[in-house]
Amino acid sequence: CPLKFIRLTYMDLTDRMLEILKADKTVVVLLSTHHRNGVGSQRAAMHKLLMAGCDVPVVLHRDFRETDVELLQLKSAADFGTLLLDGFGDGLMLHNEGCEAVVSDRCMFGILQATRTRISKTEYISCPSCGRTLYDLQTTIARIKEATSHLKGLKIGIMGCIVNGPGEMADADYGYVGAGRCLLYTSPSPRD
């Protein structure tokens, strides 16, 4: 059976609608909101679905009107990330009138990566650099990214000094730390 997508808001989740959702296993809810407190509205809707025993897939949907990409990233990460970290939502749908779809796509993949919902790229951890850094950190980061960006799912730490580096990249799969000469570390055991 093909899937049926139905766009709903918190106010649409009446007792009758909840019964319909429970009975039809081909429905995917596109949970939208235009409420001033959109996160609260979508969280309340998710709780209502849970309390009613509706085990339907839910795609969190938000509309934005941002021309500044960084502002879009901040707002959408705050709105979607909060819910995903709480375990709500099975997918994201971001619509923004102020930018191209590819920007929205990158933004959504970044949110999914940051919340560990879906890993789709290499993750990098780096320090901002300080007086203890004994090499050109920015150039090194660029070179490492160029050589490793295809390694989906890896976490790579790139630190400027041996003082804080190992601790700050403790959960990385690989680490690159400068100490006059650079030391390469690997995690002691495989990560999930």
Region annotations inferred by a language model:
Residues 60-86, 154-181:
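Active-site-adjacent loop and "lid" segments of alpha/beta metabolic enzymes
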Residues 1-10, 26:
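Long, compositionally biased, glycine/small-hydrophobic-enriched stretches that function as flexible linkers
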Residues 100, 182-183:
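Glycine-rich nucleotide phosphate-binding loop and flanking beta-alpha elements
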